[in-house]
């Protein structure tokens, strides 16, 4: 089987990671104790168990154990996961934690405190990987604004890549926003992390607290959304994005196939996820949605989990995952209509850049749903926002002594800043590129070659 090792780091990473395990355990019929309860229909049972090995190991007495590693620099988060409803699901040796915490300092997570803990984490990752028949890759949930998730999370990514250079690395990264800020130095932590992710990951889903809050206020009409509400939205998206990996299907059935379809240039692997229909926790969707409504909602800027407007950029590639009993023909027609009506929002130099998959099993409580993964040049808005905040502080060298005190060099900040600005320019370059530009690029290349 094509197994995935899941790693969750830091408080945010552990909270969204645990919520993800709750939701997929429910979809696969796995109880909080790890036991499988037989599906009502035999067909459903086969679908639930056919690819269960992608995320679970089968333990003794027929129990299923998540192939997960839970990491934090302080024990608090682990205690709350253990005490939670699904705490019994994880093996005790999957928890790796320090005692100190990293006090919102990226350098502590990446160079000092985190570096001391990283070997114990790699041991657990190694053990889990060795038990796999055919490991396809790793997925990491973390936030970029905190410390353990950003500093230690990116350290883990680079260490794992050293050992498993040919496996796929996917991250679900929560990007900080000024509206929902825990600490002043979030722009520093995020910029230093993105500097690492650009080079070291194959796919990064950008989840944005600002977008999640907007969805809670505008769409779900929640007056005081909690982190629980935000995590609920994230876990819906994660469940949707991983549907093709967990259930039998043809399209994007493993991480590498998804990467090949979605990433036209290696650095441009930051995706904008979306979900439809959006529902609040605990509420049931009473009105059944039609496929046209789902498709419309899915492409709507208000449904995006990253705070950027796709209408300000162009889609390089798109993957859509529909779930529930529906007509494939209708899905294809609707997707075709969207592309035709909005052709200016899709780059014309990648033909067939929208891929659609359909899975029969809908999420709990819904008749049908759709998950959207877009590689859009509009994601540069998100990087610009972080970059502006970074520059404002870095120009005054504010808070820098906390980082240099842990052995970091100012040069690393300058490099991270310019790498992020380069990323923004690359997105801009491909946003403006047209199919006719190709000939010009080739001619330039030939001329340069002559002068070499």
UniProtKB/Swiss-Prot annotation:
GO terms for molecular function: GTP binding; GTPase activity; metal ion binding; structural constituent of cytoskeleton. Pfam families: Tubulin, Tubulin_C. Mg(2+) binds at residue 74. It is found in: Cytoplasm, Cytoskeleton. Its main location: cytoplasm. One of its GO terms (cellular component) is cytoplasm. Residues 434-452 have a biased composition (Acidic residues). CDD domains: beta_tubulin. It comes from the Eukaryota. Keywords: Cytoplasm, Cytoskeleton, GTP-binding, Magnesium, Metal-binding, Microtubule, Nucleotide-binding. PROSITE patterns: TUBULIN_B_AUTOREG. The keyword 4Fe-4S does not apply. GO terms for biological process: microtubule-based process. Its cofactor is Mg(2+). GTP binds at residues 11, 74, 143, 147-149, 209, 231. The keyword Cytoplasm applies. SUPFAM superfamilies: Tubulin C-terminal domain-like, Tubulin nucleotide-binding domain-like. Residues 431-452 are annotated as: Disordered. Tubulin is the major constituent of microtubules, a cylinder consisting of laterally associated linear protofilaments composed of alpha- and beta-tubulin heterodimers. Microtubules grow by the addition of GTP-tubulin dimers to the microtubule end, where a stabilizing cap forms. Below the cap, tubulin dimers are in GDP-bound state, owing to GTPase activity of alpha-tubulin. Dimer of alpha and beta chains. A typical microtubule is a hollow water-filled tube with an outer diameter of 25 nm and an inner diameter of 15 nM. Alpha-beta heterodimers associate head-to-tail to form protofilaments running lengthwise along the microtubule wall with the beta-tubulin subunit facing the microtubule plus end conferring a structural polarity. Microtubules usually have 13 protofilaments but different protofilament numbers can be found in some organisms and specialized cells. Belongs to the tubulin family. This is Tubulin beta-2 chain.
């Amino acid at each position: 089987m094509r197994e995935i090792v899941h790693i969750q780091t830091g408080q945010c990473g552990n909270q969204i990671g645990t919520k993800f395990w709750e939701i997929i355990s429910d979809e696969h019929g796995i109880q909080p104790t790890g036991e499988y309860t037989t599906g009502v229909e035999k067909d459903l049972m086969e679908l639930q168990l056919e690819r269960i090995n992608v995320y679970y190991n089968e333990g003794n007495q027929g129990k299923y154990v998540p192939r997960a590693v839970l990491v934090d620099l302080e024990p608090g988060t682990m205690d709350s996961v253990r005490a939670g409803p699904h705490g019994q699901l994880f093996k005790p040796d999957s928890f790796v934690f320090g005692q100190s915490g990293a006090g919102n300092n990226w350098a502590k997570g990446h160079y000092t405190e985190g570096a001391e803990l990283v070997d114990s984490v790699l041991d657990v990752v190694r053990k889990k990987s060795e038990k796999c028949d055919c490991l396809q890759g790793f997925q990491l949930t973390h936030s970029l604004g905190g410390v353990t998730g950003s500093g230690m999370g990116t350290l883990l990514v680079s260490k794992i890549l050293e050992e498993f250079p040919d496996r796929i690395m996917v991250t679900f990264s929560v990007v900080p926003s000024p509206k929902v800020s825990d600490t002043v130095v979030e722009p520093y932590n995020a910029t230093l992390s993105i500097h690492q992710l650009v080079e070291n990951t194959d796919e990064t889903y950008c989840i944005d607290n600002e977008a999640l809050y907007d969805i809670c206020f505008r769409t779900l009409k929640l007056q005081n959304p909690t982190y629980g509400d935000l995590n609920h939205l994230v876990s819906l998206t994660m469940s949707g994005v991983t549907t093709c990996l967990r259930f039998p299907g043809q399209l994007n059935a493993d991480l590498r196939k998804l990467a090949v379809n979605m990433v036209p240039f290696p650095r441009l692997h930051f995706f904008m996820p979306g979900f439809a229909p959006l529902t609040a926790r605990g509420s049931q969707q009473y009105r059944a949605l039609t496929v046209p409504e789902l498709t419309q909602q899915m492409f709507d800027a208000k449904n995006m989990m990253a705070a950027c407007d796709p209408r300000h950029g162009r889609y390089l590639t798109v993957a859509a995952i529909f779930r529930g009993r529906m007509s494939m023909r209708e899905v294809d027609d609707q997707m075709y209509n969207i592309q035709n009506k909005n052709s200016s929002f899709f780059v014309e130099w990648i033909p067939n850049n929208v891929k659609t998959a359909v899975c029969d099993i809908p999420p709990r409580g819904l008749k049908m749903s759709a998950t959207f993964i877009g590689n859009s040049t509009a994601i540069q808005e998100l990087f610009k926002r972080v970059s502006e905040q970074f520059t404002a502080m870095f120009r005054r060298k504010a808070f820098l002594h906390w980082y240099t005190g842990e052995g970091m060099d100012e040069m690393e900040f300058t490099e991270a800043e310019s790498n992020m600005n380069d990323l923004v320019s690359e997105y801009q370059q491909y946003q403006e590129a047209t199919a006719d530009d190709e000939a010009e690029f080739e001619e330039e290349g030939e001329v340069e070659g002559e002068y070499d």
